[in-house]
């Protein structure tokens, strides 16, 4: 029963498609989709492979995924070769097994089985696949969505196969994502000899009260779908050409804010810059807006997927819109009916990444039931 989804997962894992390289993963998928009668549009942009595939007419159900993976890291720490799919103790090991080649295999096999049983199904099934999700994303779904909008393509429902499950398959789904805003802050002082602190302004000492308040900022209390907005300082360093007997003239601070739908970019920037001004800090700051938060408007889609998950796992999933960003934020420009669900994320981006083989079959069956409920 596992053979098809397991074999396809293994084929994809055996390709070292480190982002943004695809190296043939998508052609494996495309050939199988063509046999099912899908129209294929390759949308390759610079070093990134993308494709849009569809079959049928009417309301469109889109499966969204990525064939790229993060690097393996230190191969010496792996128990198996990261790009040789290996079965051991009921698990499938390999880079991308959980994030997200296993999910892509489950999607495709579910669609194959569905079309074989219901060749005259109503509606349209589509796939949107990229090889640039794990790194910049600049030539991936972001640009493809713009192209599809120009062509007046319509997506009614979108299922993203990101690894949303936590401890066990089916325990978590996502119907939204937090926004992300980063800051590169330069705090200025005056450089001088460390033995004469009264003559100079030490930007490190001067910034400590501000940094303490910054790290404790409360933007909101969160809501039913989102945790409170959070801020994390990621890097602090003084100017490079400063020896141990010098007061530095500059201090550079990097921080990131993950925010929900209760606040926006302008409000966050205003709060942070008001805090800087409160402490009379001389500064310059450069903001990078990575992603806007979103929340799916479709309780229908959430309830439908919940029933499918329960049918095959006996678990009612929790809604947890935490974690990083995903390509779902770009699809939100085409549809606000989005749900994310996939394999457990316990080992993603780690050495010895793996999935349980039984989970691959269960996920395939959940995706199949999802299609049944939407298109029959």
From Swiss-Prot:
UniProt-listed InterPro entries: ArgE/DapE_CS (IPR001261), Bact_exopeptidase_dim_dom (IPR036264), DapE_proteobac (IPR005941), Peptidase_M20 (IPR002933), Peptidase_M20_dimer (IPR011650), Peptidase_M20A (IPR050072)
Key word Amino-acid biosynthesis present: yes
Cofactor: Zn(2+); Co(2+)
Active site as annotated: 68, 133
Binding site for Zn(2+) 2: 99, 134, 349
Cystine pairs: none
GO terms for biological process, alphabetical: diaminopimelate biosynthetic process; L-arginine biosynthetic process; lysine biosynthetic process via diaminopimelate
Binding residues annotated for Zn(2+) 1, in chain numbering: 66, 99, 162
Co-factor binding comment: Binds 2 Zn(2+) or Co(2+) ions per subunit.
A Gene Ontology molecular function term of the record: zinc ion binding
Pathway connected to this protein: Amino-acid biosynthesis; L-lysine biosynthesis via DAP pathway; LL-2,6-diaminopimelate from (S)-tetrahydrodipicolinate (succinylase route): step 3/3
EC number: 3.5.1.18
Reactions that this protein is recorded to catalyse: N-succinyl-(2S,6S)-2,6-diaminopimelate + H2O = (2S,6S)-2,6-diaminopimelate + succinate
Enzyme class: hydrolase
Keyword terms of this UniProt record: Amino-acid biosynthesis, Cobalt, Diaminopimelate biosynthesis, Hydrolase, Lysine biosynthesis, Metal-binding, Zinc
SUPFAM superfamilies from the UniProt entry: Bacterial exopeptidase dimerisation domain, Zn-dependent exopeptidases
UniProt xrefs under PANTHER family: ACETYLORNITHINE DEACETYLASE, N-ACETYL-L-CITRULLINE DEACETYLASE
Family in the record: Belongs to the peptidase M20A family. DapE subfamily.
Function: Catalyzes the hydrolysis of N-succinyl-L,L-diaminopimelic acid (SDAP), forming succinate and LL-2,6-diaminopimelate (DAP), an intermediate involved in the bacterial biosynthesis of lysine and meso-diaminopimelic acid, an essential component of bacterial cell walls.
Descriptive protein name: Succinyl-diaminopimelate desuccinylase
Organism: Buchnera aphidicola subsp. Cinara cedri (strain Cc)
Gene designation: dapE
